[in-house]
């Protein structure tokens, strides 16, 4: 029946029109959403950086826009937003990432751009000036550390080293660790038990914190320090039952069980060591050189803070791993790759890189910037001396490309607390971790192909 | 303009009016009912378009994802049919999380309804400063959940929280409130702390109970408890049913454990104490920590169906005990 002009639509027609409107609206929204890197006529291009707010100051951005003639737009790093932007086909031009665990993951999924041609013609980021830590951002389709470069680290630390507070050592009569010879992990734990201060069931001073940058990469590093590999040669499986991985896992579970520092079963409300260490409530903190950036801002704390070499396992090799190597990568579908590269060069080789190097927030990733590391004060000289000696033992613990580090960590977080409370043996924990993590890795390998 | 011109102009206008008349007469007349319908659709269309765009479309997309191995990043995902749903049936972590969520719902919903109703009864009495009490008791309900989470984390922190400070004063050792086995009790306390919402709705219901019925019962010698049980509760039963349904839906979807966690990051959320690792936490972890968008979408769809079933069951079993002042069948 033809509808009368002016008559109200039928219910069915109205719903159909609404659905049509919704689809049209969705299409319009999709077109409008996340418009990045569109050319800006007359004032250069726009480059979108997905970074943390403290990665770049507004002043540096303003200066860069002036110097490079490129408009820089920043978006706060958020994995859900990144996925939405990648899915939408409008990714940021440069994205923050942790080289040790993200580089191979993104490269294996074909979403990261190979940067070798850009490096080859760069006069700012010369290949012979790159610190070996940047190899964390290389991946040859099988192994991290080889093959094309997919990103670069902005700075780095050897994340198994630790800071200690001499005042708290003095108070409990514990000897300072050597500046040149590492303690064993067992000695470190023994010291932490002597340094911890408790009252009425409350911990007033943590003896030591040892949690690495994340449990998955920490356990990878600890296993390497015990002389083994957590992953099989093709990175498709973990093996916590090997003597070395079992030793590493057992040590970490012991650390949590004796409750000398923050852990899953004793969470620190500050979520990281910085504020607790700054408040003189932590005698040892497993943070690498980068924590110096925070310590240098508090002169009283700096006076009593020292950096110590990474511990070793009895009979294990002396290695000192980098668990982070945080930097930037360029999505394959970035719109303004050439402009993004100009920003990339500036971020890693010019003003921001110099500011990071002189602030003590990590070791510069260009050898030519090493001379800017802070060394004016006595304590800074001590820290630099220890750090320079430690660089001889620099090592990388390769990570699997088949799983997100958070995914492997989620399995650990679900299963391990029982072992930390003494309700499960370490051998049972190792078996359960193998089973659950290998299933996740198998799915990832199928996905990557 | 001369008189003749004016007259001519007027004549022209009249002619135009006359010519318009038949067109206006031909225009279909809109009945009042049709006008009402049109107004109804005009006023509801923003909501309906929003509903289609922001609810139905994402749900349909999530349903499609639940049949795939999509991980949010890789272009190499594939269609796997019902595999994600099959896996879900044998995933012990999912079942454990679902069990904890169910236990939380059957504990927290009755406790908050009883607590809210109790508070409503108290502030419905002729007290001095009744308005002040009502405001104070309702205040927690207007605190944003994130603020409540931060406040409770500070309050129950093992080493610096006021709760352990108070325990120490009375000679007790500090407890690890935010870890197992105590974390579940803190979660329950946060939920009960916000019972002001239930109090307000119950209070409105209480004020609708006819006073004459209470007076008649009193004259007949009924005790206060008997009056409450036999008059107040039956008359409040539709309100209680509403609170039960919305309470169950809210409790199975709660994200409060996340807000109470020490580290509310993608990886940190998976470190939530086991007793608080509820279904939505598992969904969150599967989406963002593990990156299994397909599996997590299947989890969400199963939850959606379970909520529908639970709501249906609540309506089915409440039909004999909910008393409607107005016959709900009257308009059928």
Please state what every model-predicted region is.
Chain A
Residues 66, 87, 250, 254-260, ...:
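Extracytoplasmic/periplasmic substrate-recognition and gating elements
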Residues 102-159, 308:
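Hinge/lid segment of periplasmic solute-binding proteins
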Residues 116-131, 178-181, 199-200, 204-209, ...:
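Short, solvent-exposed loop/beta-turn-alpha elements that line the ligand-binding surface or hinge
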Residues 75-84, 182-187, 264-278:
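Short helix-initiation/N-cap motifs at beta->coil->alpha
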Residues 190-194, 234-266, 310:
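Glycine-centered hinge/linker elements that transmit conformational signals in sensory
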Residues 1-111, 121-127, 177, 314-316, ...:
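Conserved N-terminal structural module of periplasmic/extracytoplasmic solute-binding proteins
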Residues 141-155, 160, 186-238, 282:
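Extracytoplasmic/periplasmic solute-binding protein
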Residues 144, 308-309, 358-414, 418, ...:
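Long, aromatic- and glycine/proline-rich binding clefts that accommodate carbohydrate-like moieties
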């Amino acid at each position: 029946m033809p509808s009368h002009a002016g008559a109200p639509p039928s219910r069915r027609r109205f719903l159909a029109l609404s659905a049509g409107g919704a689809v049209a609206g969705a299409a319009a929204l999709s077109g409008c959403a996340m418009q990045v890197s569109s050319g800006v006529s007359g004032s250069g291009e726009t480059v979108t950086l997905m970074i943390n707010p403290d990665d770049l100051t507004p002043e540096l951005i303003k200066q860069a826009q002036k110097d490079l003639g490129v408009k820089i737009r920043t978006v706060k790093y958020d994995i859900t937003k990144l996925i939405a932007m990648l899915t939408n086909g409008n990714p940021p031009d440069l994205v923050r990432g942790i080289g040790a665990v993200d580089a191979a993951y993104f490269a294996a999924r074909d979403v990261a751009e190979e940067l070798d041609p850009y490096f080859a013609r760069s006069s700012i980021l010369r290949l012979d000036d790159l610190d070996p830590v940047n190899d964390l951002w290389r991946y040859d389709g099988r192994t991290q550390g080889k093959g094309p470069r997919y990103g670069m680290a902005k700075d780095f630390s050897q994340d198994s080293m630790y800071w200690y507070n001499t005042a708290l050592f003095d108070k409990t009569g514990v000897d300072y660790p050597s500046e040149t010879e590492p303690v064993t992990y067992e000695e470190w734990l023994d010291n932490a038990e002597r340094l911890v201060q408790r009252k009425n069931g409350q911990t007033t001073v943590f003896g030591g914190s040892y949690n690495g940058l994340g449990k998955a990469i920490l356990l990878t590093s600890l296993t390497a320090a015990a002389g083994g590999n957590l992953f099989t040669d093709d990175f498709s499986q973990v093996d916590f039952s090997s003597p070395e991985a079992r030793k590493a896992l057992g040590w970490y579970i012991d650390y949590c069980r004796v409750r000398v520092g923050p852990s899953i079963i004793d969470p620190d409300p500050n979520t990281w060591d910085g504020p607790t260490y700054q408040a003189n409530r932590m005698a040892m903190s497993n943070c690498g050189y980068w924590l110096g950036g925070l310590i240098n801002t508090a002169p009283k704390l700096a006076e009593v803070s020292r950096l110590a070499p990474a511990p070793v396992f009895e009979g294990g090799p002396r290695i000192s791993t980098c668990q982070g190597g945080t930097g930037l990568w360029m999505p394959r579908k970035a719109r303004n790759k050439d402009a993004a590269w100009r920003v990339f060069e500036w971020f890693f080789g010019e003003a921001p890189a110099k500011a990071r190097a002189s602030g003590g927030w990590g070791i510069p990733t260009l050898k030519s910037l090493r001379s800017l590391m802070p060394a004016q004060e006595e304590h800074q000289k001590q820290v630099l001396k220890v750090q320079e000696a430690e660089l001889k033992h620099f090592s990388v613990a390769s990570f699997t490309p088949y799983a997100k580090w958070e995914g492997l960590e989620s399995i650990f977080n679900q299963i391990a607390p029982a072992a930390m409370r003494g309700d499960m043996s370490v051998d049972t924990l190792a078996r359960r971790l193998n089973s659950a993590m290998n299933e996740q890795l198998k799915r990832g390998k199928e996905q990557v192909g | 303009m001369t008189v003749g011109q004016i007259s001519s102009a007027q004549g022209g206008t009249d002619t135009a009016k006359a010519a318009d008349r038949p067109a206006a007469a031909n225009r279909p007349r809109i009945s009042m009912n049709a006008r009402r319908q049109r107004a109804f659709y005009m006023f509801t269309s923003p909501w309906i378009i929003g509903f289609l765009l922001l609810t139905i479309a994402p749900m349909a997309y999530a349903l499609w994802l639940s049949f795939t191995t999509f991980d949010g990043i890789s272009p190499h995902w594939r269609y796997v049919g019902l595999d994600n749903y099959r896996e879900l049936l044998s995933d012990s972590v999912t079942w454990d999380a679902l069990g904890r969520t169910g236990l939380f719902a059957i504990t927290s919903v009755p406790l908050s309804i009883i607590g809210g109703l109790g508070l409503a009864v108290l502030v419905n009495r002729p007290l001095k400063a009744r308005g002040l009490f009502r405001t104070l008791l309702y205040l927690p309900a207007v605190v944003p959940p994130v603020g409540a989470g931060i406040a409770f984390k500070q309050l129950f922190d093992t080493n610096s929280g006021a709760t352990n400070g108070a325990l120490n004063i009375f000679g007790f050792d500090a407890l690890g409130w935010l870890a197992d086995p105590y974390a579940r009790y803190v979660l329950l306390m946060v939920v009960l702390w916000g019972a002001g919402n239930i109090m307000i709705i119950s209070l409105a219901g209480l004020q609708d109970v006819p006073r004459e019925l209470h007076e008649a019962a009193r004259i007949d010698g009924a005790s206060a408890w008997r009056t409450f049980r036999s008059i107040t509760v039956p008359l409040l039963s539709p309100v209680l049913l509403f609170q039960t349904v919305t309470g169950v839906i809210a409790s199975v979807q709660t994200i409060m454990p996340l807000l109470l966690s020490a580290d509310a990051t993608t990886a940190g959320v998976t470190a939530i104490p086991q007793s608080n690792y509820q279904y939505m936490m598992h969904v969150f972890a599967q989406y963002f920590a593990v990156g299994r968008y397909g599996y997590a979408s299947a989890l969400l769809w199963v939850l959606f169906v379970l909520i529908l079933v639970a709501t249906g069951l609540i309506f089915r079993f409440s039909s004999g005990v909910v008393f409607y002042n107005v016959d709900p069948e009257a308009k059928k």
